[in-house]
């Protein structure tokens, strides 16, 4: 049983570039299924999202900014908005939806029943025991 990791390499690209498409290529070495992502880069004019008014944004966040700070933060906020625009441009049609991020593959151990030799010690350690059940506090907030 092995673990999976995603290695991301940061490439210095101008802000006007965005990911055009994202494809998956399956590689099967030693009966393990690995996923390799390939993407192509395409120059664009930036995000279709409109950058917010920094003064109004600061007021909404209940922070005070002077005019110099507004001028300093405006390009940085536009850059973040452009990054969100790049995310919107990613083609996800070739990606199968997943319920959880780790739902691909089987990462569970074998379900093998075990017999505990110190049963009485375990029962003595729990706060509430009603034969044959161990009572635990309510976990879900169902009423």
Swiss-Prot record:
Alphabetical UniProt keywords: ATP-binding, Chloroplast, Ligase, Mitochondrion, Nucleotide-binding, Plastid, Protein biosynthesis
InterPro entries named among the record's database cross-references: Asp/Glu-ADT_sf_sub_c, GatC
SUPFAM superfamilies: Glu-tRNAGln amidotransferase C subunit
One term of GO molecular function: ATP binding
Similarity remark: Belongs to the GatC family.
Main function: Allows the formation of correctly charged Gln-tRNA(Gln) through the transamidation of misacylated Glu-tRNA(Gln) in chloroplasts and mitochondria. The reaction takes place in the presence of glutamine and ATP through an activated gamma-phospho-Glu-tRNA(Gln).
Subunit structure of this chain's protein: Subunit of the heterotrimeric GatCAB amidotransferase (AdT) complex, composed of A, B and C subunits.
Protein's name in the database: Glutamyl-tRNA(Gln) amidotransferase subunit C, chloroplastic/mitochondrial
């Amino acid at each position: 049983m092995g673990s999976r990791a995603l290695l991301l390499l940061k490439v210095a690209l101008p802000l006007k570039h965005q990911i055009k498409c994202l494809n998956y290529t399956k590689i099967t070495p030693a009966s393990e299924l690995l996923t390799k992502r390939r993407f192509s880069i395409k120059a664009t004019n930036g995000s279709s999202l409109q950058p917010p008014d920094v003064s109004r944004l600061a007021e909404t966040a209940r922070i005070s900014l002077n005019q110099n700070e507004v001028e300093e933060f405006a390009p940085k906020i536009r850059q973040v908005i452009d990054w969100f625009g790049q995310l919107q441009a990613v083609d996800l049609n070739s990606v199968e939806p997943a319920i959880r991020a780790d739902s691909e593959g089987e990462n569970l151990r074998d379900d093998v029943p075990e017999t505990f030799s110190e049963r009485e010690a375990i029962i003595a350690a729990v706060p509430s025991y009603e034969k044959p059940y161990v009572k635990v506090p309510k976990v879900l907030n169902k009423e």
